[in-house]
């Protein structure tokens, strides 16, 4: 949960939260949309991690997970920019817009990759999905409520460095825990 919450700060989905909150000013459907989209996306990612866990020998898995965590550590240092331009909500409203936008924004994102890695490492699909989803909500719900005024004061560079160090430490521990 902490890993995903820290990795999410300054991420494109957090920027998406900020944009949705500023544009539509409807926190409840936005947060519910984040919850539903994240549960769906991270369930798929976690299932992939479980499949990888079952497929690979423990030593091979350890090296892949450790190397992947180190790669995510490097990736965490790169700031995200939100490329999507949101249009007016569909006839289904802000909730559906948020679900679709978040699900798509999470594809191939750091937190989705982290979910795959954590599920492969811990072989506990439900706990990983719940934990990563809570991490997403911890990072995004305050942004929805605080809007741009509070988000402008967050030291994103320092948080990215902290997230990178956390992923690097997890990667190194994973690689060398057998020794």
Predicted regions and their residues:
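Juxtamembrane transmembrane-helix termini in multi-pass membrane transport proteins
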Residues: 1-54, 114-135
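Short hydrophobic "helix-edge" motifs at membrane interfaces and signal-peptide entry regions
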Residues: 1-2, 98-100, 145
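Selected transmembrane alpha-helices and immediately adjacent juxtamembrane segments
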Residues: 83, 87-112, 118
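Membrane helix-loop-helix hairpins that form the core translocation module of multi-pass transporters
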Residues: 25-94, 142-153, 159-165, 172
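Hydrophobic/aromatic residues within the transmembrane alpha-helices of Major Facilitator Superfamily
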Residues: 5, 9, 39-40, 74, ...
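Juxtamembrane boundary at the C-terminal end of a transmembrane helix
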Residues: 172-179
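Hydrophobic alpha-helical transmembrane segments of multi-pass membrane transport proteins
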Residues: 134-143
């Amino acid at each position: 949960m902490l890993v995903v919450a820290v990795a999410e700060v300054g991420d494109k989905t957090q920027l998406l939260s900020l944009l949705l909150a500023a544009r539509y000013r409807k926190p409840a459907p936005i947060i519910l949309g984040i919850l539903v989209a994240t549960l769906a996306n991270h369930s798929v990612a976690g299932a992939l991690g479980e499949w990888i866990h079952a497929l690979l020998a423990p030593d091979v898995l350890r090296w892949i997970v450790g190397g992947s965590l180190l790669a995510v550590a490097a990736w965490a240092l790169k700031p995200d920019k939100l490329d999507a331009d949101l249009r007016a909500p569909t006839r289904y409203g802000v909730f559906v817009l948020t679900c679709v936008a978040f699900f798509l924004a999470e594809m191939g994102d750091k937190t989705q990759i982290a979910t795959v890695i954590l599920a492969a490492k811990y072989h506990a699909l439900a706990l990983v999905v719940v934990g990563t989803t809570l991490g997403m909500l911890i990072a995004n719900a305050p942004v929805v409520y605080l809007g741009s005024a509070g988000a402008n004061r967050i030291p994103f560079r320092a948080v990215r460095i902290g997230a990178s160090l956390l992923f690097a430490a997890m990667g190194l521990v994973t690689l060398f825990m057998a020794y």
